[in-house]
Amino acid sequence: MSFVGGGGCGGQDVHKFVEALQADFKTLSLETKKKYPQIKEACEEAISKLCTAGSSQQNSVYYTVNQILYPLVQGCETKDLKIIKFCLGMMQRLITQQVVDQKGALYITNALWTLMENNIEEVKVLQTVTLLLTTNTVVHGDTLAKALVLCFRLHYAKNPTIVNTAGATIRQLVSLVFERVYLEKDSVSSLQQQQSSGSPAEGEGGNQDVQTFASDAFLLFQDLVQLVNADQPYWLLGMTEMTRTFGLELLEAVLTNFSAVFHESNDFRLLLKERVCALVIKLFSPNVKHRQLPAPSNGNAPVPAEKPYFPISMRLLRLVAILIQKYHTILVTECEIFLSLIIKFLDPDKPAWQRALALEVIHKLVTRSSLIAFFCKSYDLKNHATNIVHDMIAAMGSYIRYSLINASAMLNGQQNGVANSLTAMSGSNQCGFMFRGAYLPLVATYAPGVSKAVYLEMLDKIDASNIPDSYGISVGHAILLDMTRSIGGVIQRTPELHPSHNTAVITEEEHKPLCLQLVNSSWSALLSAFIPLVETSIDEATTENILKAMQNYAALCGMLEQLQPRDAFIMAMCRASFPPHYAMSIFANTTQSDGDLRCHTRSGSQDLSSQFINSCSGDAGDFRPQIVAVGTPLPSASLPHSVMQAPVMLTNKNLQCMRAILFLAHNNGGILGTSWHIVLQTLQHLVWILGLKPSTGGSLQAMPKPAVEANVGIQTAVMADLPVLSQMLSQLFESSQYLDDVALHHLIDALCKLSHEAMELAYANREPSLFAVAKLLETGLVNMPRIKVLWRPLTNHLLEVCQHRHIRMREWGVEAITYLVKSALQFKHKTPLKENMELQTMLLSPLSELSTVLHADVRQRQLDCVLQILNTAGEILSFGWPAIIEIIGAVNEHHGEPLIRTAFQCLQLVITDFLTVMPWRCLPLCISTAAKFGSQTQELNISLTAIGLMWNISDFFNQNQDKLMSTQLQDVSILPDFPGTVKMPQFDKLWMCLYAKLGELCVDLRPAVRKSAGQTLFSTISAHGSLLNPPTWQALVWQVLFPLLDNVRALSSSASNEKVDASGNILIHHSRNTAQKQWAETQVLTLSGVCRVFNTKRELLQMLGDFERAWSLILEFIQNAALSKNGEVSLAALKSLQEIMYHNTAERTERALKDPQTAQEQDEEIWTIAWNIWLSIGMESTKMSTSTSAKLQQQNSNGAETQEDFYIPSQAFLTALIQIFPAIFQHIQVKFTAADFDKFCTVLTNAVCIPVQTDAVPYIMSTVSDTLLTPLHDGILDCMELIQKEATKPDSHISQLIPAIFRQLLIFSKFACAPPTFQQSVEHKYAKSSGHYANNASVEVVSMNYIPFGEKSISICVKLYQTTATEDSVVQEQILHDIVKALRTPLAMKYKCLSSSTWKLAISSLISVLHTGLKVARAKPQHFASLWDDLADTLDKFLFPASVCTIEDRGLEEIVLDETIDCQVIELLRDEVLPHSHEMPHQFIMQIVVLLNKGSIHSASDTNICYESDWKLREIFAKTCFETLLQFSLLEDHANTNNNRLNANVLTAGAAGAGGKDFAGRLAVTALLHRFQEVLKRFNDDERQSGKCPLPRFRLSEISFVLKAIATLVVSMKKAPASKVNKPAWDQLIGLYPYLVDCTTTTSPEVSRSLREALLQYTDLLQAPRSCSAATSNDNVIQSNGQE
């Protein structure tokens, strides 16, 4: 092999490898330079070889490997450990790189051999050998043999590490040699050719000609056999030592892993047969001859044979197991010998470990069904061969029986010299077997089909450890189970999980004889082994496994029609289900002959069984099975009297056996044949003992025992298993459906026989067993597909049972018949029962025959059956309806309520489910019958359910309309007549019949019936009314619905108001505790229902005529209900009205398009009616007059009175009323007049003033928060906005309503500050509120939050004004004045407002309307003369409110924001008023100037103000006022002419009649100077009085502001024209100078800075300006007036 092929490396890797080799050789050269010059020279030569190689370095290394190996071999001969290690490492590297050829491999092997002989680096040597053989295949033949011998030699060294390493290496290399055989395709054929040319290698050396991998493997295996046989090897020359155990292990490994080699090669096969088998038989000799006998009493022991050696025997058995498992097809005779030997190893005289090993081998073999099949085919089926299968199972049975008897004998000390290791069982949860007190626990458990050896795996043990006494029976028990499983696998041809390639093939022809032989060879031996195991097992799991095996085996026998083995196993299981004496009694008269069974099933275990039975009643210390159930014996003719008297005690094992029988019969009922009787007899006894009684469908359930049966009981644990047993019983009879007809008749005959026996006992007044009747029922149920086969015999016997005088027998006879009839009718037969009259008649015949039975209970059960038939199979009763209805109709009231209830249930099912299969003519009768049940008064639930049935009928009519319409009834007399409608179709008459009957039930005396009937009536009309012809609708409205409304109204008004008697357990809610309240509910239901129908079919009714009359009538009904004193009725009426008003459909539009004029006229008429009805409802319901208020107050004073005397409409009612208006308004807006609007506003105002009752709080609170509008308020404002929107449209018909809209909104806006009172609705619109109803604590009403409502009204008003300010009606009606007056209230209250948002909204609204309105006022002053005083007063009261606000109340940020709002007002005056003063009244301008003066100096505005808390922060406001004053009084405007005109106007309009052109301006300056003087004087006085204590900060800020203002004023006066400032003003300014000087003593830096600015401005005033030397007398007058 070349390097390239082996390494697969690239050129670069090769180059690196060569360099590494050169480096290693250089290192080796240096190491051997002195001591080993010849190695040094060889290294240098190797280096030169590597250096001088050609360009193909890969081939160079391979071709020069032998030269470069030379120094390495020499190095290994030096015995220098360091050099040897280095050389071995280089060798391993060369081997790894696969550059070593055969010659090189020989060199390496020789070198390693030398190291081995010198005991140097043994581990490294083994590693190198492993590498040499595993990395390539160049080593074979003698070189391979030498390498293997080398490893064998090291395996027997003294160092344990080397021994273990060498052992592992040998195992690996031996496997490697055989693995190579698979790689060589022609190895087998070459060996076969060699065989044909000459005899196989027997002599020394073996075959030397063929150097193949197969020959290597052959020679190796041959020598291993030689070495194990203590002979000299032929090929492995140089072997000095070889243990037999190691050789056997190697042989086992080869035979286990490479069986294909032996199967495919004749040489290997011959070697196996002639050498290996002979070796095994030879080595087995000590095991066969040795016997373990007890020591004789005289002490003279015979000379023992050679004693078997455990390690050899164990390995031999492992080898035998492999030979049998893998090579049985080529070693047939040898395997027979091996199996016979293994079976003999189970003899009692063999050592315990030898028996244990044999058991483990047998277990390995029996888990493979293919092996069992091969054994039977090769041995048991042959005439002169050993019956291996039979002998194996018989040996197991003998071994198990011996184990049990021996354990008991050892426990009782009957065997001398044997140590007693068995003790009585101490725990209760043990697994195993117990015989006569000797306990054999299960020490080994196995998964099914899996063997797990213990002693066969003790490869490291010299001797077997102590084997537990119960180990053998544990393995033997598993062997029997797996043997049964394997036999089943053979018979059923179940594939193995892990099949081998050499498994014997069983053909179809061979299979049947093989299976029969298997059963014949195994059944008696298996049964004789199973019986003692069942009898002695003490745990459920073990017993379960054994019983499963017995079930499976019995089933297999049945499959093969082997009756004797089948019956033997079934009988054994049945006997095990009872205590022994009871079993003997009940099976004494069994017709089945069990003589043969006795010879097979009890021969080996009869004594054992009797011993075991006796042991149960032996000494007190013995094991006693736990009794789990005690019951009375089933009365039977076969039971002796003694047995009848004693209770039957069942153990858990008995119940397990019962389950096993059930399982067997369930899964394999077809093979029972004549055994059915014994099986059913067994089950009947067990069912009786356990107390299982039949229940529905024939299944059995546990029933409580009578208290008198003190000696009878079932443990709790078993009670939980009883349902499982019952289910298994049911499943057993369910499986009868898979039996053929003959087998089924066998089963029914057996059940009938048992039933006759029970009937005979019942005639003797003894409690009968109902098992047979129940199971006849179950059998019939599961065999419905072939019901004709068994119906006659089955039902005839059951009818006979129904006539029995014993009530239990009779009950179950009826139960069985009725259940069978129901099931048969429900079953889906091949020919559908609906079409099979013969079968239907046959099935209903037994039910009809029951009518001849006189017993009342039978009649009840018959009716129940009819009910259930309807419930389950009514749709197929195509031929049976007359009979069914006849049975239902035969029941009348004298039969009693139960039968009436049952009859109604039948009717209910007929109507609900089976109308489709009934004749057409039955439908009116069904309606009448249902209505009759609805009106009956015996049972309310029946009445309600009957009404539900009428809905079902309507649903049926709808779904089958086509079919019903197409069917014409000949006898029309069964349909009622409806006058007034010509030629009403039969289908419509059917509907009208239904509606009329429901309408009658709607006025029943019982509220529940009325409610149900009403709901059904309207649901039916809503769902199916579209099916009626249009003329029929008129009949429905005028003959059903309107009469219904009238009847309900009349009955409601006449209903009693006394409380209903709530006797009994029925709780009646307070809202329904009188007849009147109950009728109110009916009124709500009927009115809403009729309105909904009317609304839905409005277009149809309009086309039929009389619509206006119908419209008026239904609105009258609504009005009557809406004005009801019952809140529920009134609210429902409004909802109905709302539904009608909001109705608008495409049909209406289409009708208007077809005939627009007629449609319009009709619409106007009906909507005028609707408006009048709405107005009437609104006026009447919201009329909270003084008398009503007085009643409410009277109720407060007389607390005991009820609120029944008067009625306060709820918020929901008012909200609904208001929300209806938009729908009406869109139709009447063209005719909407001012009078209509006034009435509408009256309704709105009254609705707002209605007090809110406490029970309405959840309604309000669930929809709004404190900051949102209530639904009522929201609806009112929506209506106002709707009218406003229409009024503001161009060319609107109602534009004249705009002023009225303003006034109504302003009325609402006042509620933000003054909530309404009771009387407000009848007082003047602007009357002041005299109080609030919330103040009356005893009134059960709550205060409403009107603030959002009032504020929203203000906002709407402002928006409306902004869009309509210039309208003539708005100007002429002085709406702006009204708005100002309305806003004056919140603005004057300011901080006293309920919410700060109110006055903030008011001032922002005022600013908004003034921005808009002042322009209009200037344009049309004649309409605004009355505005100005109120406006000035409003501004003054807002800017200087009487209410007090502190930082503690509102916080600093809020006060700053408030001051900003005040400044906005001043800015409005500055921008919108003062620039246009010439266009406004003089008095108003004077009031504005006074207001600005008042605000400019805050400390001088009011001497009584608390500086600490209120006005200390209004500096910005004061500054704004001051700057506005200055701008107005002194500074030049950009338009001089405007100012002159303004001043002239002021003078002209002056009240005193004497003033100059700048009168207002000078007045402002004089007032300012006077206020400055007051502030300065007060500051100086306070500072002197305060001493060293500084004044408060706000005082310092105030004086600082005044000083800055003085400085600003001086500058402004200097710049102002002379005409604007007179001499007294200058004198007054100079007069301030002394006060300024007094301020110089202040310690405040802020004041000092401001003071300095003011004093600096006085520089130019030290001498009065000449321009002011002359002052007029008029100025003096003005000055004096200003100072005053």
UniProtKB/Swiss-Prot annotation:
InterPro entries: ARM-type_fold, DCB_dom, Mon2/Sec7/BIG1-like_HDS, Mon2/Sec7/BIG1-like_HUS, Mon2_C. One of its GO terms (cellular component) is endosome. One of its GO terms (molecular function) is cytoskeletal regulatory protein binding. Keywords: Protein transport, Transport. One of its GO terms (biological process) is pole plasm protein localization. May be required for traffic between late Golgi and early endosomes. Belongs to the MON2 family. This is Protein MON2 homolog. The gene is mon2.
